[in-house]
Amino acid sequence: MGQKTNPNGLRFGKFKKHFSCWYTENKNYSHFVKQDIFIRKFLMEKIKNVFISLIEIEKDNKETVIFIHYLNFSKFNKVETNSEKNEINLFKLKNLLLKSLNSFFNVKINFNEFIIKLIEIENPILDVRFIANDIRYKLEKRMNFRKIVNSTIANIINKGIKGIKIKLSGRLNDAEMAREESFREGKVPLNTLKANIDYFHCTAKTLSGSLGIKVWLNK
């Protein structure tokens, strides 16, 4: 069963904390869920100059705290760029978010009740979301999928992780027939909850169709 369900869902509470942490009465539950979805979608659309890996939301009776895990491309690529373009203007972002929330949900949220905190990713090559999106970007640039995966595994496997598994599906390299290709290095035991498995999937949009990308990382 471990290979037929989302590995993240099985491990919440043991190795992972939930991406949304709050408690409310039943009558407000759906409203809070919709609000979380709106916040994540809004932030992902508005923040284009850095890579957003994860958005965590914590709420209590007094305030809402949003943790944005991000990667600054200029630091990762070690290229001197305009620093203003690679920074997140928290004040402006917070104002836009509150205006959108108040308008969409017809509520009045105080500016001081909302806190946005930035957490920079220290080691992006060990971030499963960055790995999957990096593969997606290269596939959309029509690079050979085997070269992409082999270089990805070579960069990761000696960085302190126990194993990695990558699965690609679709019309790979513009083939006439869709197929599935799997790559594994090290140990990725999906049938035990003792393993700290991080998982992410995304889709690459290419001229030959959509390509599915799944990445498992055993830390």
Swiss-Prot record:
The gene is rps3. Part of the 30S ribosomal subunit. PANTHER family: 30S/40S RIBOSOMAL PROTEIN S3, SMALL RIBOSOMAL SUBUNIT PROTEIN US3C. Its main location: plastid. PROSITE patterns: RIBOSOMAL_S3 (PS00548). It is found in: Plastid. Pfam families: Ribosomal_S3_C. Keywords: Plastid, Ribonucleoprotein, Ribosomal protein, RNA-binding. GO terms for cellular component: cytosolic small ribosomal subunit; plastid. Belongs to the universal ribosomal protein uS3 family. This is Small ribosomal subunit protein uS3c. GO terms for molecular function: RNA binding; structural constituent of ribosome. One of its GO terms (biological process) is translation. The keyword Lyase does not apply. InterPro entries: KH_dom-like_a/b, KH_sf_prok-type, Ribosomal_S3_C_sf, Ribosomal_uS3_bac-typ, Ribosomal_uS3_C, Ribosomal_uS3_CS. Residues 39-111 form the KH type-2 domain.
